Structure formats: structure tokens, C-alpha cells
Amino acid sequence: MLICNDKSNPKTLLEEIMALRPWRKGPFEISQIKIDSEWDSSIKWDLVKNATPLKDKVVADVGCNNGYYLFKMLEHGPKSLVGFDPGVLVKKQFEFLAPFFDKEKKIIYESLGVEDLHEKYPNAFDVIFCLGVLYHRKSPLEALKALYHALKMSGELVLDTLIIDSPLDIALCPKKTYAKMKNVYFIPSVSALKGWCERVGFENFEILSVLKTTPKEQRKTDFILGQSLEDFLDKTDPSKTLEGYDAPLRGYFKMLKPSKL
């Protein structure tokens, strides 16, 4: 949890926080008010925080949401930090949080998507984190290509995506929805993902972790509006989504843009 002991008026603060719902990423605590977000993002952060050193590096978080991971990255002493997310509400959440957790204003927040990266930030970053974005892209290869071109030579990508448990070079393409999400297009096997990354040009593909999503990590709270993980799974068989697909399984990976093309 990110904690800030500020002297703000708790009543006013809570009103501001609730007006910015739904809070997907967190949790945060400000003036003893806990923002109990849908996701306990500390679980994912613990899996990737030591993937590569960030000290004195130029770092990006693509799909940064409200900035939770950016604020955590500040603790590792990067040279600079840029977050990318086109969402309007999550930027408002970031603007609310930044005075508490980025008092030196080190973070740049760009309202851009992954497709904008290589044109506006070519060869710019030592490290890019892209967490929970790839399966939302209609063209995952184009997204990987954009990430590749935004990295400097010898730059590293830390990637998190939904995966399927299969030894084959295949991907699940949900017919209409996956776990009630309309914007999920391709969920690859690890082998298929490795092939995609290598076709784009990445090397040294490494599996950091594979983890099932559980209600400990994602659940309904008073700080979101609507449903969460348990509403998306088959109540008679929680190993399946409502659509009959395997329940969410996430893979965490690291890869390298080579020093020479």
C-alpha cells in the first residue's frame, strides 16, 4: 500500500476520492483514508519490481492507469519516469494522487496509447513496463513492435498479459467477451507469445512468473462501481469464466531489445 500522512480535511478528501470512482489500481492511504481499490496491485508489483534495476534509468509505464506503479517506481531512483494512458478518468485520479505521492513532480503523464509510442518516443527508454495491455489490442504484434521501437538498444521490456495453458503455438480469440470484457482479442500461450516477441525482434525471452488471478488480488469493494472477478466466473465451476473459457491466468515476462540489429 502507498501511504501519505497528509493534513487534508478527511471529510472533503473522502468526497473527492468517491467522486473519482471506480478505483481499479491501488491500494492507497491518504490521511488515514484507505482507497481500497478493486485490484491489490502490490501483488503484481512484487512479481516485477526486481525484474531489472531502475536506478538512473529512463523508464516508461505503458497503460499506467492512475499511476500506482509509477509511484512505486519512484522508490527505485529512476532518472526519469513517463506514464502512458489515454483514459480520462485514470488521468484525473493520477492528478489527484500526484501531489501526495510525487511531490517533486518527477513523473510525466502522457494521454497516449501504445500505438503512439514509437512515433513520439523513438528509442527513448531503457526500461518499459507494459502490464495488462496486450490482450486489449486488436493487433498484439503491432503493439509489441511499438514497444520495441520505443526502447533504446539493449533496453528491456517487462510484460504482463493474460495467457492460456497450452504447449502449442496458439492463442484464444474470444467470440464476444472474455470474463465479461468486450475488449479482449488475443490470449496467447507462452510459446505463441515468445514467437510474437521474437518476430518483432526481442531476444532473451524470460518467464518471471505465471499466476492465476484470485479474489485476493481482484475483488469488489466500495471504491468501485459494478462487478468484479467473482461475478465474471462460473459460480458452479470457478475454474471457468461465464463464457466457458479457462479462468484468468497471467504471465509475467522480461525480454531484451538487442544492442545491434
Curated annotation (Swiss-Prot):
Domain of life where this protein originates: Bacteria
Biological process terms in GO annotation: tRNA wobble uridine modification
Enumerate the catalysed reactions. Answer: carboxy-S-adenosyl-L-methionine + 5-hydroxyuridine(34) in tRNA = 5-carboxymethoxyuridine(34) in tRNA + S-adenosyl-L-homocysteine + H(+)
Class in the EC hierarchy, top level:
transferase
Gene Ontology MF annotations: transferase activity, transferring alkyl or aryl (other than methyl) groups
Q: Which Pfam families match?
A: Methyltransf_9 (PF08003)
Task: Cite the EC number.
Answer: 2.5.1.-
Q: Provide the binding site for carboxy-S-adenosyl-L-methionine.
A: 25, 39, 44, 63, 114-115, 135, 250
Complex and partners: Homotetramer.
Q: Which family does it belong to?
A: Belongs to the class I-like SAM-binding methyltransferase superfamily. CmoB family.
Q: What does this protein do?
A: Catalyzes carboxymethyl transfer from carboxy-S-adenosyl-L-methionine (Cx-SAM) to 5-hydroxyuridine (ho5U) to form 5-carboxymethoxyuridine (cmo5U) at position 34 in tRNAs.
Q: Which HAMAP family match?
A: tRNA_carboxymethyltr_CmoB
Name the UniProt record assigns to this protein: tRNA U34 carboxymethyltransferase
Organism expressing this protein natively: Helicobacter pylori (strain Shi470)
